[in-house]
Amino acid sequence: MISLESQVLERHISFFDGKSVLFAGGISDSFPQTLASKCSSIQIWSCYFDYARTQSAVNFSVEFQGQADLIVYYWTKNKQEVNFQLIQLLAQASIGQEILIIGENRCGVRSVEKTLSPYGEIAKIDSARRCGLYHFSLQNKPHFELKNFWRTYQHSTLENLTIYSLPGVFSAAELDTGTELLLSTIDNKIKGKVLDLGCGAGVIGSMIKKRTPNAQITMTDIHAMALESARKTLSENQLQGEVYASDVFSDIEGKFDLIISNPPFHDGIDTAYRAVTELITQAKWHLNQGGELRIVANSFLPYPELLRQHFNDYQVLAQTGKFKVYSVKN
């Protein structure tokens, strides 16, 4: 089953004949692989590990160096990430580079004309499946340097910690209230091996390491920009920790004394519980005896029943009108 965006691209299959093609952005299916016989070569660049690990020949990275006759970009709702990736692609392309941009209308693809018009000619060439397809030709190359995209912030809750983040990372500009509530439950009694799952810019894991230097910190995420941000947050604050990609527990080895998370419940623009369901249902296999799973979540989300099913009982360590911090022991 291919996505709505790919279904629209199928209507314009002649664009791909005999060309080297680079697919990038929020691609989520195997459409590129189906074009292998039509194209001279295919490259895929994704910053999402949950996609990259399930497909062949995907470049999972923050930065990508590659040339192609045609670039196909899948628009996402994450506008900061879209801008970061498109500017990067345009900066390394040649004048006259041809790009197809496809996206669902509800994800804001209509704004592509405003985004790209300073750099060349853009025109809408199709509208179907609640998607828009645009054709772009590069005339004016932008400048791209990764260092220009870093953002930092501090917060009284974080003491003297400085958070570093790239575009598109959750809570990239300021400390979100859910994480702040979760941090309020952290004390200097935490010890042993700690997993910050879905680490984002590394706020939680870095704060634990700062308060309890003897804790062994591991941070994981599916987002390449988040992983790079977490690494920089650790290094710039002279903290030690391991950071790597994992789709929930897909690449996790060993067991932990604490698994802590502010788990995502938005997938694109839809609410999605898959990751959190896997986190709760599989956590006990990754916890030491007596180990703890601690998560913060919106109060309306149906996690208490799931926690009760797999851990018998749970505690609410802190709560506000909007969020609750849940704790269960293995």
UniProtKB/Swiss-Prot annotation:
The keyword rRNA processing applies. It catalyses: guanosine(1207) in 16S rRNA + S-adenosyl-L-methionine = N(2)-methylguanosine(1207) in 16S rRNA + S-adenosyl-L-homocysteine + H(+). One of its GO terms (biological process) is rRNA base methylation. Its EC number is 2.1.1.172. It comes from the Bacteria. It is an enzyme of class 2 (transferase). It is found in: Cytoplasm. Keywords: Cytoplasm, Methyltransferase, rRNA processing, S-adenosyl-L-methionine, Transferase. It holds the Pfam family MTS. One of its GO terms (cellular component) is cytoplasm. Specifically methylates the guanine in position 1207 of 16S rRNA in the 30S particle. Belongs to the methyltransferase superfamily. RsmC family. PANTHER family: RIBOSOMAL RNA SMALL SUBUNIT METHYLTRANSFERASE C. HAMAP family: 16SrRNA_methyltr_C. Monomer. NCBIfam families: PRK09489.1. This is Ribosomal RNA small subunit methyltransferase C. It comes from Haemophilus influenzae (strain ATCC 51907 / DSM 11121 / KW20 / Rd). The lineage of its organism: Bacteria, Pseudomonadati, Pseudomonadota, Gammaproteobacteria, Pasteurellales. The gene is rsmC.
